[in-house]
């Protein structure tokens, strides 16, 4: 017979579980949007987790896979697609909500990242100014990534993502080397596994 002298209860705070974290896609990720992606968590509620992919220029994403909002005119959509194809400052933030973009001034992000959301149709002139202005530290992230809390937890548990403390200086890396650098820093190789995940 076992006599219990003291019972210790451990309470896990599930809120803020992803605060100041970054998701690094495992090499087995085959989802076309999230393969080799680095996602910084920007918002967390009791039901959902939101983030922005940091390392995918929109030029790498097939424009045919992007659906624009109905409130954008055909002319705006045509101009928008032209801007996307020409600018190196527009990044693909995720496959949700293409009516908005998240603005980031890299030069002011020394200790943390601070994103400002803009509505493209309403702030179209600002949108163009950022993409073609003189300040090369300014970036726009088109769309965002959204998961249900349970969905993201399951994807991490199944090995689709690695959860890592986020260093804001990561944003200064070239997009094409960011993912490989973080994977290597975690002691993993970039060979391919079999698997899938990351559906937002």
State each model region's role.
Residues 1-14:
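N-terminal amphipathic/basic-hydrophobic helices that include classical n-h-c signal peptides
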Residues 14-141, 145-200:
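A short aromatic-anchored loop/beta-hairpin motif
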């Amino acid at each position: 017979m076992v006599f219990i002298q003291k019972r210790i209860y451990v309470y896990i705070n599930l809120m803020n579980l992803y605060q100041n974290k970054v998701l690094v896609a495992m090499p087995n990720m085959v989802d076309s949007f999230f393969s080799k992606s680095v996602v910084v968590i920007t918002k967390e509620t009791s039901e959902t987790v939101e983030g922005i992919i940091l390392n995918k220029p929109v030029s790498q994403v097939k424009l045919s896979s992007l659906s624009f909002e109905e409130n954008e005119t055909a002319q705006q959509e045509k101009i928008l697609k032209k801007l996307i194809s020409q600018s190196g400052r527009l990044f693909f933030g995720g496959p949700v909500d293409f009516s908005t973009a998240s603005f980031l001034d890299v030069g002011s992000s020394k200790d943390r990242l601070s994103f400002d959301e803009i509505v493209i149709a309403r702030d179209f002139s600002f949108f163009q100014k950022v993409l073609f202005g003189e300040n090369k530290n300014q970036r726009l992230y088109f769309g965002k990534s959204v998961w249900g809390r349970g969905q993201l937890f399951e994807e991490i548990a199944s090995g689709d993502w690695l959860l890592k403390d986020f260093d804001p200086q990561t944003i200064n890396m070239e997009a094409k080397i960011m993912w490989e650098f973080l994977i290597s820093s975690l002691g993993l190789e970039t060979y391919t596994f079999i698997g899938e995940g990351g559906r937002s």
